[in-house]
């Protein structure tokens, strides 16, 4: 079991203010966590590849498709600064050519 001094040090590092009852509770909980890691360290993981998660997560996206907005002309003409079929927007990047 973890001693009080270790719990106090961990609480200090975590910027936690705990009372003596909480110290006892944290000591039991931290000891349980360390016991669990001790059990895990007994497993043979030599042929197990390192990973950051239990299952692979990937984005599921649809394919992009190019299509016109039904009222494209109306939309462009009602914009603050239309230029042909496009929106004129303020420049946000400076280039060396300016």
From Swiss-Prot:
Catalytic activity: L-glutamyl-tRNA(Gln) + L-glutamine + ATP + H2O = L-glutaminyl-tRNA(Gln) + L-glutamate + ADP + phosphate + H(+); L-aspartyl-tRNA(Asn) + L-glutamine + ATP + H2O = L-asparaginyl-tRNA(Asn) + L-glutamate + ADP + phosphate + 2 H(+)
Record's keyword annotation contains Transmembrane helix: no
Name of a matching Pfam family: GatC
Assembly: Heterotrimer of A, B and C subunits.
Family, per entry: Belongs to the GatC family.
Role according to the record: Allows the formation of correctly charged Asn-tRNA(Asn) or Gln-tRNA(Gln) through the transamidation of misacylated Asp-tRNA(Asn) or Glu-tRNA(Gln) in organisms which lack either or both of asparaginyl-tRNA or glutaminyl-tRNA synthetases. The reaction takes place in the presence of glutamine and ATP through an activated phospho-Asp-tRNA(Asn) or phospho-Glu-tRNA(Gln).
Record's protein name: Aspartyl/glutamyl-tRNA(Asn/Gln) amidotransferase subunit C
Source organism (scientific name): Microcystis aeruginosa (strain NIES-843 / IAM M-2473)
Species lineage: Bacteria, Bacillati, Cyanobacteriota, Cyanophyceae, Oscillatoriophycideae
């Amino acid at each position: 079991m973890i001693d009080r001094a270790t719990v106090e040090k961990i609480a200090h590092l975590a910027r936690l203010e705990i009372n003596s009852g909480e110290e006892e509770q944290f000591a039991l909980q931290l000891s349980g966590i360390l016991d669990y890691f001790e059990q895990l360290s007994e497993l043979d993981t030599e042929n197990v590849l390192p990973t950051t998660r239990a299952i692979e997560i990937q984005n599921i996206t649809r394919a992009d498709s190019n299509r016109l907005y039904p009222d494209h002309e109306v939309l462009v003409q009602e914009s603050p600064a239309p230029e042909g079929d496009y929106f004129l927007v303020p420049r946000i990047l400076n280039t060396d050519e300016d």
